[in-house]
């Protein structure tokens, strides 16, 4: 039997923020028809319990036994009234259920449901949700109330539910129900935050297990009414820090049909991540469940105005190009002020609908895998005191250089935040460098570190910081021994899965390290790496900017050290002090494979500073370690993703043009000309672009084929047919 996710999904929530009951005055058949034919969606969310002030998530827009109706819906059942029309036009109907925001009055009626902080106060008392309201605990009797609501929702004939929450908030939960459950498991009281206490780490696991257990039982409530029913929630994205709200996408994926996370565009000071939608989608895809990337098309917190057309399209095309589905927050109120503001989205979704078969049943073609580790996000706190020193920004203005105070941060919570910020930059840095250089790569997760999974790749990247178990390290070692290649940097793999130091001979040896003597004095600026030979696009004696943090280590025998650190300088505008004998890069042949190790956090440095020499190092190292199946000659702002269509054998190559006007939000996308793509594949007989269906002119030399794309505007798909 076909499933909801067998075809690409174009989800939308059509909202009435000022008055939810306006839906009962609509012509429901015309509304469903408009959404299908004009908006081109095939899956809609409809509000079952609103997320509205002052926390009215306990009120329903439909008849539900034992539940109070939302004002305006006393004589109107929104779900039972609308579902026949949605299904008539081929739209699957999912119900939005608010599970995190409740009024103080409702909480007073259920005094043992609220989440309690370590200080003994309800979370909502200290941190009112959206300025007014509180939240409930997944281990309290509220869970049974929630499951009854889900069952009542599914009885209406809808196709599934989306749960907006629950959320286990920071410093929660210390309620009596959590205390009892924790004590049953660990025979101890719940500790307060203390990163040196192993029991605190158990509490982090307990919170995530509690969230997963709630979702498991919620799924049972859905399928108990409709075995084909769908359930999912906001699973959290790739950014470190998800432990604060007990969100770990892979753990939750076991009990939901989709993995969804938000990639909303918000204007803010500073640099925006150009690949926000792409990173979110690839991360969610790694959970093993269909990815859904969510965005609204309003101008950030200005909900009554539209995002620029270019940003709308960029979000959609990055998500689709990376193999994901899309969710869009739609609303009547924006259209009333600007009826044409949504036209770019209509055009884009119409294009996707017209070419639906091209985006179906795709398996990524990837030579490289990069680890995004939730273990690291949870537990990594470096043992290096140098990471916690205030170095300032290094900026020079008005004859003053900002060199910071030089003081070392002692507070462990602040240290944890620093390490999360560094890890965020590492992920963004490696991802950006790979995408800009058209490397075909997957994100993989901790659970994927097995020889069976890794054997599908030529190169594995451990970005700067990685907390790994002995078993995971042994699998990586086997991967390299049997011919795989490893890129590792800084403290990758030097901590176990709970963040405890693991500077063992086995781990250091794989990286080519004999011993770590310490770290260079941290400094922002005026410290360098020097090339010892012509390699990776550098000439001998070329200088490369050294990041603030770098390790002083000794290499084992029979390794190559083509780049060395220069001796450190105390401040800027000083003469160079010669070359140290500490390697900056180690190349270690191990079994039939090879390891390239950077003794500095290259991903973090490129992610934060965008200095081109470090992008060059990453680019050339990947080429040095493996031969790409697909080669692309295009500007770095063109993102390329490749797939094999399982049902047809076709090769599908998607190109996303991120070439904008050097500011965000983007207001124009500049067309790119003369893109060349080559690959080794003698099974391809022909090809075309879906923009015009005109046949490609393919040249062949042996098994290698090459073709050109004359002009790329915002998005293009190449379809290569098999013989």
Annotate the PLM regions:
Residues 2-7, 13-16, 34-42, 47-50, ...:
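Hydrophobic targeting/anchoring helices
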Residues 31-81, 101-130, 170-182, 244-258, ...:
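Aromatic-lined carbohydrate-binding/catalytic grooves of carbohydrate-active enzymes
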Residues 18-38, 61-91, 144-145, 210-214, ...:
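Aromatic- and glycine-enriched glycan-recognition loops and surfaces
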Residues 650-657:
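Short, well-ordered beta-strand segments enriched in hydrophobic/aromatic residues
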Residues 79, 95, 99-156, 173, ...:
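Active-site-adjacent "subsite" loops/lids of carbohydrate-active enzymes
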Residues 466-542, 568, 602, 608, ...:
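A glycine-rich, often tryptophan-bearing local segment used as a flexible ligand/cofactor-contacting loop or short
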């Amino acid at each position: 039997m076909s499933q909801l996710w067998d075809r690409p999904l174009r989800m939308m929530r059509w909202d009435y923020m000022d008055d939810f009951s306006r839906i009962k005055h609509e012509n429901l058949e015309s509304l469903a028809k408009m959404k299908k034919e004009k908006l081109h969606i095939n899956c809609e969310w409809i509000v079952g319990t609103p997320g509205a002030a002052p926390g009215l998530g306990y009120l329903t827009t439909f008849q539900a036994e034992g539940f109070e109706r939302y004002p305006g819906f006393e004589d109107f059942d929104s779900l039972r009234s609308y579902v026949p029309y949605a299904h008539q036009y081929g739209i699957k109907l999912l119900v939005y259920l608010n599970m995190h925001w409740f009024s103080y009055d409702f909480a007073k009626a259920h005094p043992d449901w609220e989440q309690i902080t370590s200080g003994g106060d309800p979370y909502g008392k200290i941190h009112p949700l959206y300025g007014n309201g509180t939240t409930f605990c997944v281990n309290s009797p509220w869970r049974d109330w929630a499951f009854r609501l889900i069952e009542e929702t599914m009885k209406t004939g809808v196709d599934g539910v989306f749960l907006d929450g629950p959320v286990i908030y920071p410093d929660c939960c210390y309620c009596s129900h959590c205390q009892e459950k924790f004590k049953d498991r660990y025979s101890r009281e719940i500790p307060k935050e203390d990163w040196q206490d192993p029991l605190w780490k158990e509490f982090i696991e307990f919170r995530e297990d509690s969230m997963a257990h709630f979702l498991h039982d919620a799924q049972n409530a859905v399928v108990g009414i409709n075995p084909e029913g769908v359930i999912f929630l906001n699973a959290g994205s790739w950014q470190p820090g998800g432990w604060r709200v007990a969100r770990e996408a892979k753990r939750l994926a076991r009990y939901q049909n989709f993995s969804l996370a938000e990639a909303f565009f918000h204007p803010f000071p500073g640099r925006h991540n150009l690949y926000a939608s792409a990173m979110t989608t690839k991360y969610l895809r790694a959970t093993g469940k269909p990815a859904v990337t969510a965005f609204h098309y309003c101008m950030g917190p200005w909900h009554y105005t539209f995002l620029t057309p270019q940003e709308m399209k960029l979000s959609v095309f990055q998500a689709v190009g990376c193999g994901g589905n899309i969710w869009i927050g739609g609303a009547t109120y924006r259209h009333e002020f600007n009826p044409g503001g949504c036209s770019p989205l209509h055009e884009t979704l119409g294009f996707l609908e017209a070419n639906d078969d091209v985006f179906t049943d795709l398996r990524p073609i990837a030579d490289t895998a990069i680890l995004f580790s939730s273990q690291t996000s949870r537990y990594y706190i470096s043992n290096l005191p140098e990471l916690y020193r205030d170095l300032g920004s290094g900026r020079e203005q008005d004859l003053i250089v900002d060199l910071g105070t030089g003081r070392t941060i002692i507070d462990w919570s602040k240290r944890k935040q620093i390490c999360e910020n560094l890890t965020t930059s590492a992920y963004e840095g490696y991802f950006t460098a790979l995408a800009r250089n058209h490397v075909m790569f997957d994100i993989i997760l901790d659970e994927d570190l097995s020889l069976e999974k890794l054997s599908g790749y030529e190169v594995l990247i451990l970005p700067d910081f990685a907390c790994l178990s002995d078993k995971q390290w042994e699998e990586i070692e086997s991967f390299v021994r049997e011919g795989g290649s490893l890129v590792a940097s800084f403290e990758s793999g030097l901590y176990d899965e709970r963040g405890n130091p693991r500077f063992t001979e086995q781990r250091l040896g794989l990286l080519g390290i004999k011993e770590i003597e310490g770290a260079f004095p941290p400094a922002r600026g005026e410290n360098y790496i020097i090339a010892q030979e012509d390699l990776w696009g550098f000439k001998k004696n070329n200088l490369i900017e050294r990041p603030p943090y770098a390790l002083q280590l000794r290499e084992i025998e029979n390794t190559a050290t083509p780049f060395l650190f220069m001796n450190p300088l105390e401040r800027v505008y000083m003469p160079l002090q010669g070359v140290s004998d500490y390697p900056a890069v180690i190349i270690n042949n191990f079994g039939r494979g090879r390891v390239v190790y950077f003794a500095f956090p290259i991903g973090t440095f490129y992610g934060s500073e965008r200095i081109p020499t470090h992008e060059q190092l990453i680019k050339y190292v990947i080429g040095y370690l493996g031969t790409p199946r697909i080669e692309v000659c295009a500007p770095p702002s063109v993102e390329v993703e490749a797939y094999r269509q399982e049902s047809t054998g076709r090769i599908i190559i998607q190109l996303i043009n991120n070439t904008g006007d050097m500011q965000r939000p983007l207001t124009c996308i500049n067309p790119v000309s003369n893109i060349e793509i080559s690959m080794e594949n003698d099974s391809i007989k022909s090809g075309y672009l879906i923009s015009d269906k005109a046949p490609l002119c393919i040249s062949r030399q042996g098994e290698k084929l090459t073709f050109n794309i004359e002009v790329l505007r915002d998005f293009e798909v190449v379809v290569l047919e098999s013989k």
